[in-house]
Amino acid sequence: MSATTWSASFGGIAGSDLEAELAQARTVDHDANEAADLEHAEATHHHARVAAQGHARGDAQPPAGALARDDGRRAADYSVQLRGVGKRYGEREVLSGFDLSIERGSFVAIVGRSGCGKSTLLRLVAGLEKATSGVLEKRNEEGGPLDTRIMFQDARLLPWKSVLQNVMLGLGRSAREDARAVLAEVGLLERANDWPAQLSGGQRQRVALARALVHRPQLLLLDEPLGALDALTRIEMHALIERLWREHRFTALLVTHDVHEAVALGDRILLIEEGRIALDQPVPLARPRARASAGFAALEEHVLQRVLKTAPNDDALSDGAYDARDEGRARRPTDVRWAV
C-alpha cells in the first residue's frame, strides 16, 4: 500500500512504567479539557456580544439554536467516512449500505462473528480493496490524503533482515535514528540487531507495531493483531497500544473477536451483523480501564450478549441500554457470564 512517509521524531520512552505514563496522560487530558472549556466559554461570550451589537443596530437575528448547530458542525471532525458503502464478491454481498463516521483521534473497536464483514471493512478503509458501491472518504486535518498503516495478526517480518532493518523497510538510511527511537518506545531497542527468529510472538508484534508507527500514521488499522498471543502478553500489548495511541493521537480502528479486548481499548464498540452495524456502543469507562470493576464486566456482558443474541431484550441493548451509573452497583456472580 502506497502512503506518504513522514519524518518521525519520537521521545526515548521505553515503556518501563506504563501505569505512571498513563496517569500522566490522564493529567494532560484533564488540562486539555479545562482549556477546551475555557475556549468554549470565550466563544460563547463572543457570540453573545456580536448578537447584542446586531440587535442594537436592528440586524436580523439567526434562529434560536443556529449558533449551537454551527458549533456542532465545526466540532464534528471525521478522519474516515463511509456512506452507503457496499462490497460484493461475485454473488455474495458482504457489506450493504454501510454508513460509518470515525472521529479523528478516536479508538474504535469492531466485533462480530466470523464472516460478518469486519476484515472486509478494514481492507476497504486501508485501500487494499475497492468498494462495489457507495463513497469512502479519508482525509487529514487539512483535507489531504490520510497516511494509513495496517497491522495484521501475523507480524510479517522478513527473516533475513534484522529487527532494525524490518522497522526501516521502505525508508532511507536517514530514518535509522527514527527507527531506533520507535523501537525504544516499544521496549525493544536492545534487540535492534537480532533476527526475527530470535524473538517471541509478542516481541515480533511489537516490531510490527514499531514498523507502522515509524511512519507517524494518522490512521492505524489493527486486524486482530493480538489473536495468536497468550493472555498475559495480550494484556501487556493492550497497555502498550493504548499508551502509544494516547501519546501520538492517531485514529485507531481495531477488528477483534475478543469482546474483552474491545472494551479494554475502544472509545466505541461497533457490532457488525450481516454486513451492517447492529450495535454502536460508546465505552463510558475511564482510562486506564479497571478490568476487575463491575462497570467493565457489565459492559463486556452487555456487548457479549448482543453478539451471541442471548440478551432478554435485543432492541433495548441495541438502543444503548447500558448505563455507566450501574458501574458501582452490586452484582451477583450469577449476573455475569464470562467469556472463556
Swiss-Prot record:
Top-rank taxon: Bacteria
Topology within the bilayer: Peripheral membrane protein
Location in the cell: Cell inner membrane
Region (Disordered): 44-72
All residue ranges annotated as the ABC transporter domain in the record: 80-299
Primary enzyme class: translocase
Subunit: The complex is composed of two ATP-binding proteins (SsuB), two transmembrane proteins (SsuC) and a solute-binding protein (SsuA).
Recorded family membership: Belongs to the ABC transporter superfamily. Aliphatic sulfonates importer (TC 3.A.1.17.2) family.
Function of the molecule: Part of the ABC transporter complex SsuABC involved in aliphatic sulfonates import. Responsible for energy coupling to the transport system.
Protein name (database record): Aliphatic sulfonates import ATP-binding protein SsuB 1
Organism encoding this protein: Paraburkholderia xenovorans (strain LB400)
Taxon lineage: Bacteria, Pseudomonadati, Pseudomonadota, Betaproteobacteria, Burkholderiales
Gene: ssuB1
